[in-house]
Regions:
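Sec-dependent signal peptide recognition
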Residues: 2-9
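Mitochondrial intermembrane space
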Residues: 22-137
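Generic marker of residues within folded, mature protein domains
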Residues: 11-13, 64
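N-terminal signal peptide c-region/cleavage motif recognized by signal peptidases
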Residues: 14-18
């Protein structure tokens, strides 16, 4: 009886973890960089694109093109809408991303740069996200 209770306790801990892990998987079956890039370009929003990038990144220089798609999708939300001060701040954030790992060798650092740029664009785009309630109107 004790072993049954112990087994159930272990299952109670593992089952939610398995469900969370499944949710964190890349939704793109193939995992080829071209397919990931295409899938992210078809994401409905900047936010969805960034989340997909986080789940599907490869951790190498292959993330440069994938991150560029996310960055472009997010930049489209605020293009022509930023004040001079906001443009300057975004430019500074991009500069930080471009220089932070510039002296580091290795493709993972190019991935870090791509993530940094995508996250900077996402942060600037956030005030321009459409509220969920108004999407159907």
């Amino acid at each position: 009886m004790k072993s049954l209770i112990a087994s159930l306790a272990v299952l109670a801990v593992l089952v939610p973890s398995i469900a969370v892990a499944a949710d964190d998987r890349c939704p793109i079956e193939s995992l080829s960089i071209d397919d990931i890039t295409k899938g992210i370009s078809q994401a409905p929003t900047c936010d969805a694109a960034l989340k997909m990038f986080q789940k599907c990144s490869v951790g190498t220089s292959g993330d440069i093109g994938i991150g560029a798609v996310v960055t472009q999708k997010c930049e489209a939300l605020f293009e022509g809408k930023l004040s001079t001060q906001q443009k300057r701040a975004y430019s500074q954030a991009r500069h930080v991303c471009d220089t932070k790992y510039a002296k580091e060798d290795g493709t993972m650092y190019r991935s870090f740069e791509a993530f940094c740029r995508a996250q900077a664009a996402h942060k600037v785009a956030m005030p321009f996200f459409q509220p969920a309630a108004s999407k159907g109107k």
